[in-house]
């Protein structure tokens, strides 16, 4: 179950669905463009990059382009489960233009597959007791998310997910 289905995040998203919070895509991108240069920000606390406008099971390249444009000079990042060939191509472009899109692997084996695309950084969810860095069967280094390991490190102070990197970030599963 996704963490956005429970607790405070679920309450927030219910209000968004009722139209009590949030805004439309174009306004959202315009607001992001107004952030100061160099500003670190994360997109999509829950959910994913938008689906193609024609309903195909691929990300929407126009909306991704708007997000990339809004991010110019900033340090935005997100995560995606869009892994079809077309999406991989657009993720590669977004990363080349400085909007960091982390490809989310569903298994250690998939890490190696996604890394082979060379479209951008990769992350993976690990068992809850994962504490040691390791290498995948394909030899890719997986580093346990520092913010999950030390109380004095936060996403804002670490910033590893926003960096261009060859290292995979592993997130130990948590919650219910």
Q: Which sequence ranges carry the predicted segments?
A:
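Conserved AdoMet/S-adenosylmethionine-binding subsite of the radical SAM
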Residues: 22-149
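Interdomain linker/hinge connecting the two RecA-like lobes of the SF2 helicase core
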Residues: 6-10
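Short cysteine/histidine-rich metal-coordination sites, predominantly Zn2+-binding motifs
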Residues: 14-27, 170-176
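C-terminal accessory extensions appended to soluble enzyme cores
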Residues: 134-176
């Amino acid at each position: 179950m996704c963490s956005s289905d429970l607790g405070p995040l679920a309450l927030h998203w219910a209000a968004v669905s009722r139209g009590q919070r949030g805004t439309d895509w174009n306004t959202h991108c315009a607001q992001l463009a107004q952030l100061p240069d160099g500003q670190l920000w994360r997109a999509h606390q829950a959910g994913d990059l938008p689906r193609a406008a024609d309903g195909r099971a691929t990300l929407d390249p126009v909306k991704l382009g708007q997000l990339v444009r809004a991010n110019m000079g900033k340090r935005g990042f997100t995560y995606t489960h869009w892994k079809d060939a077309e999406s991989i191509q657009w993720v590669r472009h977004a990363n080349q233009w400085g909007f960091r899109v982390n490809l989310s692997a569903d298994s250690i084996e998939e890490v190696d597959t996604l890394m082979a695309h060379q479209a951008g950084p990769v992350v993976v969810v690990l068992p809850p007791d994962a504490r040691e860095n390791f290498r995948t069967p394909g030899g890719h280094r997986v580093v346990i998310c520092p913010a999950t390991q030390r109380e004095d490190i936060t996403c804002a102070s670490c910033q590893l997910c926003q960096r261009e990197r060859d290292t995979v970030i592993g997130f130990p599963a948590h919650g219910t």
